Amino acid sequence: MAEPLKKPEPPEPARDTHLIGTPFRRVDGRAKVTGTTKFADDLAFARMVYVRLVRSTVPHALIRGIDLSEAEKVDGVLGFLTGKDVPIPFGILPVSQDEHALCPDKVRFAGDPVVAVAAVTEDAAYEAAWKVKVDYEPLATISGIEEALATPEPRIQDHGDHGNVHKQVSMTFGDVEKGLAEADEIFEDVFFYEGNTHLPMEQHATVAVPEDDDRVTVYSSTQTPHYLHRALTKVLEIPASRVRVVACSNGGGFGGKSDPFNHEIVAAKMALKLGRPVKITLTREEVFYCHRGRHPVLMQMTTGIKKDGGRVSITAQRLRTALDGGAYGSYGVASTYYTGALQTVTYKMPAYEFQGVRTFTNKPPCGPKRGHGTPQPRFGFEVHLDKIAVKLGINPADLRLGMLAEPDSVTANWLRIGTMGLKRCIEAVVAGSGFRERWGKLPEGRGLGLACGSYLCGAGLPIYWNHMPQSGVQLKLDRSGCVAVFCGEAEIGQGSDSVLAAVVAEVLGIALADIRLCVADTDLTPVDLGSYSSRVTLMMGNAALQAAERARDLIAQAVSQQLEIPQSRLVFAERRVFDAADPDKGLSFQDAVIAAEARFGTLGTTGSYIPPRSPGRYRGAGVGPSPAYSYSASVVEVEVDPATGLWNPVHVWIAHDVGKCINPVLVMGQVEGGVYMGLGEVMMEEQVFRRLPRHLSGALVHKFPSVLEYKSPTFEDMPPMTTYLIEEPDPQGPFGAKEVGQGPLLPVMPAVANAIWDAVGVRVDQVPIHPHMILKGLQAKAQGAPARFGPKAFPEIDFGETLLVPTPDEGGDGTAINDYREKLRSGMRSSAGTMMTREEALQKKRLAALTTDLKGA
């Protein structure tokens, strides 16, 4: 029987803050706006050489030979690398170690790297790269999901569940068939979400510098220095102590720099080979090839609805997803699970079935992009709900408000919800936009759409399961009154450096100017797993909070003794430590540190963070759990020209449950940035591939490998926006804070689709929404057919054996009743890979630092 969920107690009573919750300048703001920030491509070292990668010109082929003879004649060429020089595979997930720094014998997409050329100048490297000749033996090319399902041979990868299916998932929570049978009405829809790329302002760049004793330092525009360090150590076959990774400031990442990449490993290998610094900066075209962008996903959604007077509830839902994963694994196993995992955290759903499949195709590999795996099903779900509301004659806002998931509850698929501000988010955007009064009543061509969303505040488990902290922070206090803060977090433009500094400054009562940051350096900083899954504020923030509170306690002991004041009366504020009862009695923070050092010696403290254990213990439950979930709601107003199908957003209202604002200005920037990215995806952005006609070879080609042709919105395309920051402090977050980097994007795309329906009565069930789609819907409407544009059917797919997991309401314990394979696994983790506590592991006489293999997960 599942234990009833108890609301976690706050670590201490709510307290007044001085810096937290107020607008303040970013700690890196001046450097960013004056151009003095050093990005990876800005770095230069003596005797530095340049490397270009020779990439495959065909999408699928065996490598029969490489001719370097003409390239070797180019003046300034220093050396080459091929696949035989870096034979060890790598990948971000333990279960998908399927990439090579350079392809040894086979290319899997147009753009796969084959040869690296080093030269003293960039021009020489380019010229030599063009003169490398590669002899290919073409193989059959697989272009999409249905083709991959129907074509098991030739296999693109040797691993995966079968044929060209990388991963298949099937799990049922509760009695879905019974729930559908009890429904008054059953609704079913099919949706498609096209893939797209991250398009950060900064292209990927890396500089590798060889040092004494066969050491190498890699400076890179990475979001995950810890995982890059791991990959370099593996592929280069040198001890971890010989590899240093420094994550430079990123000019945007959005998930696109969270894998270890070929060019990073090639740069390090070439630097060690030549004994000289090596720089690789990708062109924008190359970024399109290695991007790891959003998966194209085809979805089928079936929902049972019960009507009880004016109240509507979901009885059960079945979701099926099919992902086009491209040529490599990347984060794909996790991506597959994410298309179904978070479906249950917004609305009550007593029974839920999720089936998903990820296929390999001969395209650049897909991975995590802002919202990782969740924008696609969220688009489908919110449009699906809008159709239900219209069919039942209910205002879409009332439909959602009547079926919200409960705070402090456990979902059917065993996700633990804490605080939940979605009700307030909906109420804010509905009131601000006049949705109740205006929806369905605007002139033809003008419409309003509402949608909601939710996202993680950090993944509950690390990529490599272990008992160690997911984030660590170390403080060094010196006699000047300054505090040095060391942390492995990566600043990718989201303001994490400012959050780190603010948490420490708040606890110690000092100014941001008194903080010195050393971040994202694997030689100097404690491990932080990186900037992904919206984990940084909550996880790094909690580690920083713990380290700062430990430092405060040491200082308080010394000041209490010196001033003969109880520690409980000491206040840390305004660069002083003073008596709350007599503020004139106290010490400057500098003198307080000196007193503490005199008593305790050199001052340094550490903090770390490990997420709470998830109640789910079935195979696959490792994807979805989070210490907390953020919530968002959006209303979008659009105008549509029925004659052309052209549409434009007129205004966006967005509300986000942020828990507690660390810095409202930073939060607003993240919310509005997410909205703009969402508008780009629904308006125009798509990573599209097309087959050439057979008489032109039938090859699979990239349609938009440039910013000019890919199309992304500019300032001219963006509408006015009204933003509401909803604060419901969550006890799991530092000062109650939750994520803000990814969640606000999720409701934007479905809100637009719903607004277009309100404007012209056409349902476009796919993203992006192009004018011709609206026109075709209008033409169908005029002919008396359904006014819809989108996929017509979901293919028949064998998803394999279904895991049967009883829900909390059914008295389940978080395990699957038929997961015999997992029941045989004992050891460090539960059946889901959810970690035991350290104490449990030690009781079993196992090493707390031992990591477990994801093989077969």
Q: Where on the chain are the PLM-derived regions?
A:
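Short acidic, glycine/serine/threonine-rich loops at helix termini
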Residues: 90-95, 128-131, 220, 229-231, ...
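Extended active-site and interfacial segments that coordinate phosphate-rich ligands
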Residues: 27-31, 130-143, 223-225, 230, ...
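Short beta-strand elements
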Residues: 31, 37, 205-210, 298-307, ...
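Thiamine diphosphate
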Residues: 244, 249, 253-275, 279-282, ...
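C-terminal catalytic domains of large/alpha subunits in multi-subunit enzymes
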Residues: 74, 83-84, 237-242, 272-280, ...
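Glycine-rich loop/linker segments at domain edges
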Residues: 22, 28-31, 163-206, 296-383, ...
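Helix-loop-helix junctions that connect adjacent transmembrane helices in secondary transporters/permeases
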Residues: 152-236, 403-482, 617, 696-724, ...
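Flexible, low-hydrophobicity surface segments
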Residues: 1-165, 186, 460, 856-857
